[in-house]
């Protein structure tokens, strides 16, 4: 067998990997073999650090044992060296375990020492005093020192905390003031239209999107505010974003509308500086650029309104032509009446402010008409947007409405002109100015009559629901103390643009012009008729009989204002009669007729011999009305009727 050549046989284990799981279908799941690092970790986990090493026990027992003989020392040492040489190692990680254990012990000791020194909870290090303290004072002194140190430590902790809080609050405030440019730009985009052109950010102030046709571009530029030093304290009104608007839109502007009775000389007209309003203040909490842009947009709108009014003033053909001089438009709605519309634009420079301060005058600006001008221009914008009609069907090209309606049923030129004829901005504002002036003149006339004439009383009840071209007022003429029985005169005045329409209680309608004298004469005649109507109502209440009544008497002196009214009433017994004549200018005249038997100055007649003729009423006698007692006309008349009525008792 020794001569046979050896054959190498490869022997493999039946299973190189451990089986983790065998499935129901016979599939085996194997565990992956450990890598070198995982194998090293598995071996390190087997280290038992609680067991002591044999070398430490021998070192501990060596000093305690007896010293060996000097004679046999060399032999024993050789024997031990031989044993050590041939003694196998107890464990390969023994030295590593020992070094880690000693390092852990040293780290624990170092941690304890540092904790005691830092926290001072477990130990307090005090310097050793040279002189020994008295036994009685030492405990109190130590206690006082410990209290002082504890209080000082607590105070230092509180001061450090307060300092940290102060720093945090200051940092928060600085962060709020130092707002980011992008966040401000986002806020600006929420309110205004922006677009980026190259490296610039441009915005739009115009009303083109709302239907405006004003040619001004109204473009502003958004810039970054770099005029502040970030190293210094930041002011409260600092904003990293700023806007740059055109120079012609800076400052503030408004449209002044005034009505003057006397027109000045045309040669004196020119560019007037009527700006008396303070510059708009920014709202609390709103950025300064918002106020700046709103003021610029308002200037642009005022310029558009004035341009539209100037264009219409030149184009409209009227009996009295409108005058346009620089920043003023002058019109005459009524004779001796002037309507002035001015564009007042004030920039932020000091010169314009000084000019406005040097020329104080009476404020006659009509804020209602200014507000109505803004409403009218917005309505004009809306009409511009709605005038474009979409084609039907949608695929058809755009075209004007009257072109699409042309055909067999097409309108002629006159019908088209009547449909398209609309009032302009200037015509509407002139009509509103006429109505406002006529309404104020009517109110002034009624107030002057009410303050000048005490009997009868005139009352005006203005309606709260009015139109821009029409207002209504209810006029009541009454006597004090007799309001329930004297309700005959009730007038409804409908104030229009050029006329006043008067509606009586019985439905009669009278048209009055814009002249103040016509309304005054009409009210005076109605007040005169009220006295006669009051006597009629009083006679019915007291049982007197009305013999005659007339609102327009043809006898007697002619009144320059209206006509006189008259009434004649008789007592219940028929013995007495009272005749009242009242005129707007002549006033009241009262006559009383007595029975013949009470008239001593009548001449005796030979014809009337029978006594029955003595019961007839004699001639009229005038009453001295000024000497009658009573607070008003109706009260005096009541006293007169009571005196002439027979006593029923």
Curated annotation (Swiss-Prot):
- Keyword Transcription present in the record's keywords: the answer is yes
Pfam families annotated for this entry?
Med17
**Location within or outside the cell:** Nucleus
Highest taxon, organism lineage? Eukaryota
The Gene Ontology biological process annotation of the record reads: positive regulation of transcription by RNA polymerase II; positive regulation of transcription elongation by RNA polymerase II; positive regulation of transcription initiation by RNA polymerase II; protein ubiquitination; regulation of transcription by RNA polymerase II; RNA polymerase II preinitiation complex assembly; somatic stem cell population maintenance
Question: Which keywords describe this protein according to UniProt?
Answer: Activator, Nucleus, Transcription, Transcription regulation
* Cellular component GO terms, alphabetical: core mediator complex; mediator complex; nucleoplasm; nucleus; transcription regulator complex; ubiquitin ligase complex
Disulphides: none
Q: Which InterPro entries match?
A: Mediator_Med17 (IPR019313)
MF terms per GO, please?
Answer: nuclear thyroid hormone receptor binding; transcription coactivator activity; ubiquitin protein ligase activity
Q: Where is this region: Disordered?
A: 51-79
Describe the task this protein carries out.
Answer: Component of the Mediator complex, a coactivator involved in the regulated transcription of nearly all RNA polymerase II-dependent genes. Mediator functions as a bridge to convey information from gene-specific regulatory proteins to the basal RNA polymerase II transcription machinery. Mediator is recruited to promoters by direct interactions with regulatory proteins and serves as a scaffold for the assembly of a functional preinitiation complex with RNA polymerase II and the general transcription factors.
Q: Could you give the subunit structure recorded for this chain?
A: Component of the Mediator complex, which is composed of MED1, MED4, MED6, MED7, MED8, MED9, MED10, MED11, MED12, MED13, MED13L, MED14, MED15, MED16, MED17, MED18, MED19, MED20, MED21, MED22, MED23, MED24, MED25, MED26, MED27, MED29, MED30, MED31, CCNC, CDK8 and CDC2L6/CDK11. The MED12, MED13, CCNC and CDK8 subunits form a distinct module termed the CDK8 module. Mediator containing the CDK8 module is less active than Mediator lacking this module in supporting transcriptional activation.
The family this protein is said to belong to: Belongs to the Mediator complex subunit 17 family.
Q: Would you tell me the protein name for this molecule? A: Mediator of RNA polymerase II transcription subunit 17
Which species does the entry assign this protein to? Mus musculus (Mouse)
The primary gene name is Med17
């Amino acid at each position: 067998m020794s001569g046979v050549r050896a054959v190498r046989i490869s022997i493999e284990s039946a299973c190189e990997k451990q089986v983790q799981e065998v499935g129901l279908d016979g599939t085996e799941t194997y565990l992956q073999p450990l890598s070198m690092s995982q194998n090293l970790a598995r071996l390190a986990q087997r280290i038992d650090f609680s067991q002591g090493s044999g070398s430490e026990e021998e070192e501990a027992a060596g000093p305690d044992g007896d010293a060996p003989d000097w004679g046999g020392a060399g032999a024993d040492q050789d024997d031990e060296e031989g044993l050590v040489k041939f003694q196998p190692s107890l464990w390969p990680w023994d030295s590593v375990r020992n070094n880690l254990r000693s390092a852990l012990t040293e780290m624990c000791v170092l941690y304890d020492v540092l904790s005691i020194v830092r926290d001072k909870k477990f130990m307090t290090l005090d310097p050793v005093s040279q002189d020994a303290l008295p036994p009685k004072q030492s405990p109190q002194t130590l206690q006082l020192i410990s209290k002082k140190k504890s209080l000082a430590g607590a105070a230092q902790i509180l001061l450090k905390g307060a300092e940290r809080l102060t720093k945090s609050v200051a940092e928060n405030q600085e962060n709020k003031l130092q707002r980011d440019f992008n966040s401000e730009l986002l806020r600006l985009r929420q309110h205004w239209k922006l677009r980026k052109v190259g490296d610039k950010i441009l915005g739009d102030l115009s009303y083109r999107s709302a239907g405006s046709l004003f040619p001004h571009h109204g473009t502003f530029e958004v810039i970054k505010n770099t005029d502040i030093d970030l190293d210094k304290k930041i002011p409260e009104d600092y904003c990293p974003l700023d806007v740059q608007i055109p120079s012609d839109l800076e400052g503030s502007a408004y449209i002044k509308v005034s009505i003057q009775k006397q027109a000045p000389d045309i040669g004196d007209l020119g560019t007037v500086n009527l700006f008396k309003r303070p510059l708009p203040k920014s709202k609390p909490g709103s950025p300064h650029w918002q106020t700046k842009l709103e003021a610029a947009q308002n200037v642009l709108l005022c310029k558009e309104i004035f341009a539209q009014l100037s264009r219409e003033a030149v184009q409209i053909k009227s009996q009295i032509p409108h005058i346009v001089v620089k920043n003023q438009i002058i019109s005459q709605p009524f004779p001796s009446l002037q309507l002035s519309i001015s564009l007042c634009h004030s920039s932020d420079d000091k010169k314009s402010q000084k000019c406005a301060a040097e020329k104080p005058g009476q404020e006659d600006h009509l804020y209602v008409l200014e507000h109505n001008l803004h409403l009218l221009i917005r309505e004009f914008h809306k009409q511009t947007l709605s005038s474009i009609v979409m084609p039907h069907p949608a695929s058809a090209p755009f075209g004007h409405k009257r072109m699409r309606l042309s055909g067999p049923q097409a309108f002629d030129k006159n019908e088209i002109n009547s449909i398209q004829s609309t009032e302009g901005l200037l015509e509407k504002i002139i009509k509103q100015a006429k109505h406002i002036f006529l309404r104020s003149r009517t109110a002034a006339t009624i107030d002057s009559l009410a303050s000048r004439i005490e009997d009868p009383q005139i009352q005006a009840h203005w309606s709260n629901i009015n139109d821009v071209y029409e207002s209504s007022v209810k006029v009541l003429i009454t006597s004090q103390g007799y309001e329930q029985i004297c309700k005959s005169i009730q007038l409804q005045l409908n104030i229009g643009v050029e006329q006043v329409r008067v509606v009586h209680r019985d439905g009669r309608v009278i048209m009055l012009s814009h002249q103040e004298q016509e309304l005054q004469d009409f009210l005076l005649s109605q007040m005169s008729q009220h006295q006669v109507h009051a006597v009629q109502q009083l006679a019915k209440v007291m049982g007197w009989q009305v013999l005659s009544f007339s609102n327009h008497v043809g006898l007697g002196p002619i009144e320059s204002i209206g006509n006189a009214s008259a009434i004649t009433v008789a007592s219940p017994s028929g013995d007495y009669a009272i005749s009242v004549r009242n005129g707007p200018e002549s006033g009241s005249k009262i006559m009383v007729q007595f029975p013949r038997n009470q008239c001593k100055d009548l001449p005796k007649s030979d014809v009337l011999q029978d006594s029955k003729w003595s019961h007839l009423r004699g001639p009229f006698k005038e009453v001295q009305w000024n000497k009658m007692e009573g607070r008003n006309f109706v009260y005096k008349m009541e006293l007169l009727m009571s005196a002439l009525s027979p006593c029923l008792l």
